[in-house]
Amino acid sequence: MSRTARIERVTKETKVLVEIDLDGTGKADIETGVGFYDHMLHQIARHGGFDLTVHTVGDLHIDAHHTMEDAALALGAAVDRALGDRAGIRRYGAATVPMDEVLVRAAVDLSGRPYVVHDEPPLAPYIGPVYPTSMTRHIWESFGQSARITLHVDVLRAARPGGHPDAHHVVEAQFKAVSRALREATSLDPRFTGVVPSTKGTL
């Protein structure tokens, strides 16, 4: 069974195309116009093991908010569609990822119930010229809502003792941790082929 999806989201603010194959090999074709965001979406493909295309044209002459939000919404919708009825999946996934001085934990439940908890310290306002660090939480909230998942992202350590957080490392470690957790949660459990992982019988 093919676990793929294609989502096109068009508004007066953005035009987004997302294609995903949950059983891919980490290939990525990413163009959002926000360089650091492109870098983060590459992490999702590589560390999630997904083949991922994200093409976005947005109103970057205003700011990056709509572009980043709508790409996250479309990505979540693509994951939701690719999962189908969610039968046979492991459902739960968790990963703790270090990136030098930073340590991040992510936990995922493909529950069908959108809920996001995100905890990170104050960071420098921008990474690169146009990625506002305040948007990271909103990305996870938008993604979790449209993917219909429960997602917890906790920055356990943001800096070495006495140091200041490196925003690049803090955000990148989050994307890598979430990707690894998603990889586990979306993977198929051969012991329960065709079985929805819930006592309710549906997710």
Curated annotation (Swiss-Prot):
<comment type="pathway">
    <text>Amino-acid biosynthesis; L-histidine biosynthesis; L-histidine from 5-phospho-alpha-D-ribose 1-diphosphate: step 6/9.</text>
</comment>
<dbReference type="Pfam" id="PF00475">
    <property type="entry name" value="IGPD"/>
</dbReference>
<keyword id="KW-0963">Cytoplasm</keyword>
<dbReference type="GO" id="GO:0005737">
    <property type="term" value="C:cytoplasm"/>
</dbReference>
<comment type="similarity">
    <text>Belongs to the imidazoleglycerol-phosphate dehydratase family.</text>
</comment>
<dbReference type="InterPro" id="IPR020568">
    <property type="entry name" value="Ribosomal_Su5_D2-typ_SF"/>
</dbReference>
<dbReference type="InterPro" id="IPR038494">
    <property type="entry name" value="IGPD_sf"/>
</dbReference>
<dbReference type="InterPro" id="IPR020565">
    <property type="entry name" value="ImidazoleglycerP_deHydtase_CS"/>
</dbReference>
<protein>
    <recommendedName>
        <fullName>Imidazoleglycerol-phosphate dehydratase</fullName>
        <ecNumber>4.2.1.19</ecNumber>
    </recommendedName>
</protein>
<dbReference type="GO" id="GO:0000105">
    <property type="term" value="P:L-histidine biosynthetic process"/>
</dbReference>
<keyword id="KW-0368">Histidine biosynthesis</keyword>
<keyword id="KW-0456">Lyase</keyword>
<keyword id="KW-0028">Amino-acid biosynthesis</keyword>
<dbReference type="GO" id="GO:0004424">
    <property type="term" value="F:imidazoleglycerol-phosphate dehydratase activity"/>
</dbReference>
<dbReference type="InterPro" id="IPR000807">
    <property type="entry name" value="ImidazoleglycerolP_deHydtase"/>
</dbReference>
